[in-house]
Every structure is written in C-alpha cells, then in structure tokens.
C-alpha cells in the first residue's frame, strides 16, 4: 500500500509534486567525502549510478542494481552500422529484491535517508544518479514512480515528463510520475548533476 502522499500525487495525475513529509538533508558534503575516501566510486566507464541498496548476499556491491533490471548494458556491442546491441539479462533483476543497505553507507547520513524512506514507502532500488554536463537521457517510461532528492543541481538541469518540464530544486523531495509516462532528463550546465532516486513500489 502506498503512503498517503504518494497515493494523492498519483490520483491527481501531476507529473511533479513536492513531498513535504520527509526530512531534508544536506547530502553533498557526505557524498563527496565518501568519494574522496574511496569508500564509493563511480562506474569506470559510464560514471552514472551508485546504489544505496542491494540484494541479500551482495552487501558490498554498490553497482549491483546499476542500470536496467532487464537489459545487460555492461556487455552491449556496436554493429558495423553503429547500432548498439543490448541483450536481455540471463536472470532479470527485480525491484522488490533490493532490501539491503549497502555496507558503504552504514553509519552515514545516507542510512538516515534510507531509514526515513523505508519508514514511509515500500522501496525498490535507491540510487545516486549522475547526469554529466551537456548530456540527456533516452526518452523512456519506467514501471514505477520515483521520488527524487537533488543532491547537487544548478541552472540548466531539467526533467521532462510527457510535455511537462521541471527544474527540481536542490535539497527538496520530489514525487515524479514516471510510471508508464515517457520522460527524460537533461543537463545543460557545465557541472555534474546528482540526484538520489528511489523507486516506489505499490
């Protein structure tokens, strides 16, 4: 059962809504400290996602839930026409299996964030997502709605759902109606943009 605020946002069919019943945190300093101390790191090639939670038995693997649950992007190839070929995973991952906080985030403010989220919502993956300067995501739909918390953002960073365009303010919780709604995000600035993104399950 969805928490009341999320159910309200879904019913209203709004693409973006601020969530006001979760505590706000200044995560940028803690996140940078974890990076600087090599506790966590970005993926060597994509530099796109770090997972806060994982599945049982993968407690130290903050890349386990990175990317698509269905498609194996890490083993994609490019054919002679320049078309990217991506295979399905042998065993697809499932959002509901991500129930364990990665060990690297224990005893940090990110554990407080995770506990606050799990006290209100049934979660799938919770990830820190980096959108690099002058980059745009593919136009796609998710099979869950998401709650976003911008850790670092600036002018020129926007999310688009259907035809609605929104800049998501830093250190503010946002519900995004991405379940079966086409959407993308783009970073027109000259700096990285980091969001904490939680999949909300019903």
Q: How would you label these PLM feature ranges?
A:
Residues 2-113:
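Non-heme Fe(II)/2-oxoglutarate
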Residues 134, 144, 154-156, 180, ...:
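A generic structural motif
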Residues 147-150, 190-202:
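A short hydrophobic beta-strand segment most commonly corresponding to one strand
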Residues 167-182:
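Conserved metal-binding segment of the jelly-roll/cupin
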Residues 150-169:
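A short beta-strand-loop-beta hairpin characteristic of the jelly-roll/cupin
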Residues 127-142:
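Conserved short histidine dyad/triad with adjacent acidic residue
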Residues 185-188:
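Asparagine-centered strand-capping/turn motif at beta-strand->loop junctions
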């Amino acid at each position: 059962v969805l928490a009341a605020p999320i159910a309200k946002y879904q019913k209203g069919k709004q693409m973006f809504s601020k969530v006001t019943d979760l505590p706000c945190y200044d995560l940028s300093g803690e996140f940078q400290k974890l990076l600087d101390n090599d506790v966590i790191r970005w993926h060597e090639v994509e530099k796109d996602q770090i997972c806060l939670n994982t599945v049982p038995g993968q407690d130290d693997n903050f890349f386990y839930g990175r990317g698509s649950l269905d498609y194996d992007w890490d083993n994609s190839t490019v054919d002679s026409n320049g078309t990217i070929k991506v295979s399905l995973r042998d065993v697809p991952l499932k959002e509901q299996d991500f129930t364990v906080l990665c060990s690297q985030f224990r005893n940090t403010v990110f554990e407080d964030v995770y506990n606050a989220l799990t006290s209100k919502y049934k979660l799938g993956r919770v990830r820190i997502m980096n959108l690099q300067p002058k980059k745009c995501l593919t136009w796609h739909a998710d099979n869950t709605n998401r709650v976003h918390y911008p850790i670092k953002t600036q002018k020129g960073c926007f999310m688009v759902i259907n035809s609605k365009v929104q800049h998501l303010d830093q250190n503010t919780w946002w519900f995004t109606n991405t379940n079966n709604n086409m959407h993308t995000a783009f970073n027109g600035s000259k700096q990285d943009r980091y969001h904490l993104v939680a999949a909300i399950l019903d």
